C-alpha cells in the first residue's frame, strides 16, 4: 500500500511503500528518484539532521541511480554515505554539463526533439544543491551551443546530440 509522505532528502511530496519481509520502506520521489530507507526508526533522523546541501548531494546520487536505470540504493546510516556526498560535492562543472546533456539525450529519440526541463524538479541531474545551480549549468550549456532554447522547451544542437550519443554509448 502506498501513502503520501515528505521525502527526507528534498522535503517534497513523495510516495512511500512498505515492502513485505523488509525492515524499512521504499520511496518514489519526482526529484530524488527512488530509494529504500532501511530501519527508518534508527536512520531517518540521521538524514533529516543533515544540512540541506549534504542532503542535496544524496538526492543527486539517488536520482543518478534512477536516471541510469540502476537498482534503487538502500540508505542506511547517513555516515556511510559520506564518501558519496564528497564525490558529488566534487563533481566538476564539466561533469555537470555532461550529465545534463546525457539526461536530455536520453529523452530525445532524434535530433531536434523538444524536451521540457524543470529546474524545480531536475536540479539533482546537474549535481546542484538547488534549482539555481541547475539554471547556471543549463545556461552554460546554451552558451557552449550544446543546447538551444525553443518555444516550448529545449533541444540538443548537433554538437550536443553527438556528445549525448557518445555518453550513452559509454554507459
Which residues fall in each region the model found?
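Accessory beta->alpha helical hairpin/"wing" motif in late/C-terminal subdomains of nucleic-acid enzymes
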Residues: 38, 148-170
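Short amphipathic alpha-helical interface segments
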Residues: 53-128
Amino acid at each position: 500500500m502506498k501513502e503520501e509522505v515528505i521525502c527526507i532528502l528534498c522535503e517534497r511530496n513523495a510516495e512511500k511503500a512498505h515492502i513485505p519481509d523488509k525492515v524499512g520502506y521504499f520511496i518514489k520521489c519526482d526529484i530524488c528518484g527512488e530509494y529504500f530507507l532501511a530501519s527508518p526508526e534508527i536512520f531517518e533522523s540521521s538524514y533529516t539532521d543533515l544540512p540541506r546541501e549534504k542532503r542535496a548531494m544524496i538526492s543527486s546520487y539517488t536520482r543518478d541511480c534512477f536516471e541510469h536505470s540502476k537498482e534503487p540504493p538502500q540508505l542506511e546510516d547517513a555516515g556511510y554515505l559520506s564518501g558519496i556526498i564528497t564525490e558529488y560535492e566534487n563533481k566538476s562543472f564539466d561533469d555537470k554539463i555532461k550529465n545534463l546533456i546525457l539526461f536530455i539525450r536520453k529523452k530525445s529519440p532524434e535530433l531536434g526533439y523538444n524536451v521540457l526541463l524543470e529546474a524545480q524538479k531536475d536540479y539533482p541531474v546537474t549535481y546542484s544543491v538547488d534549482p539555481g545551480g541547475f539554471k547556471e549549468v543549463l545556461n552554460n550549456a546554451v552558451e557552449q551551443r550544446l543546447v538551444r532554447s525553443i518555444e516550448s522547451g529545449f533541444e540538443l544542437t548537433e554538437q550536443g546530440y553527438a556528445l549525448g550519443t557518445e555518453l550513452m554509448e559509454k554507459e
